[in-house]
Amino acid sequence: MGKVQLTKIESYNNIDMIQTSINSMLDNSLLSKKLFDGAKVVIKTNLLMKKKPEQAVTTHPIIIECLANYFVKYNCEVIIADSPAGPFTKTSLEGIYEASGMVKAAQNSGATLNY
């Protein structure tokens, strides 16, 4: 039987608690860290539209940043990616990634964006 892990996070401002929770969840998963070294990892966000994190429409960038941090720690090439509704152009993606906080998440974690 599989495991479920829950952690109550009061605020997205507590990045240390979020990072610890994500690390614990992934460390306790069935993923083999032997697969990670040098692997390419794509983190698929849920960017429905050009909205700020405070509007709670898209995946919060702190969650994406912490996931990216985890895989970067294992020498992975991390790409934050999505294909929101509308035209798939660099200009469109840049606007959505900037508004949603994904540009900062990528910069902070060492990940890249898919454009």
Question: Which positions does each model-derived feature cover?
Answer:
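N-terminal and secondary-structure boundary signal
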Residues: 1-115
